[in-house]
Design a protein with these regions (language model features):
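General nucleic-acid-binding
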Residues: 1-23
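Short, Lys/Arg-enriched anionic-surface-contact patches
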Residues: 16-38
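DNA major-groove recognition helix of helix-turn-helix
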Residues: 39, 71, 78
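Short helix-to-turn junction characteristic of helix-turn-helix DNA-binding domains
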Residues: 39-46
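Short alpha-helical "recognition helix" segments of helix-turn-helix
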Residues: 52-61
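Short Lys/Arg-enriched helix C-cap and helix-to-coil transition segments
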Residues: 77-96
Length: 96
């Protein structure tokens, strides 16, 4: 078990009622959020970043590179939306 508590990942998924977003886009964002949640859970268990990406990729039937792209996108989106708590929690995980 990690020394860090299981963090609440701030939800960056937009409102599904947003008229600018299709149902398909919303489905993708919800899936991406699940990927990030699973990654945080794995990292909090003390699993290495590489192994955590592999586990999450297997669970969601994608490549570990795709998981990494989703994580990068979430970091960029968090910075854009000024969700600094997410970036701080993410950087804490990546340091250990």
């Amino acid at each position: 078990m990690s020394a860090y508590p299981l963090y609440d990942v701030p939800y960056l998924v937009r409102d599904p009622n947003d008229f600018r977003m299709s149902a398909k886009r919303h489905q993708i964002e919800v899936r991406n959020q699940a990927v990030v949640d699973d990654y945080f859970v794995a990292r909090n268990k003390g699993i290495s970043a590489h192994e955590a990406r592999k586990q999450v990729a297997d669970k969601h039937q994608m490549t570990s590179g795709r998981v990494q792209v989703i994580l990068i996108w979430f970091c960029k989106e968090a910075k854009k939306r000024k969700k600094y708590d997410f970036l701080e929690k993410f950087s804490l995980l990546e340091e250990h």
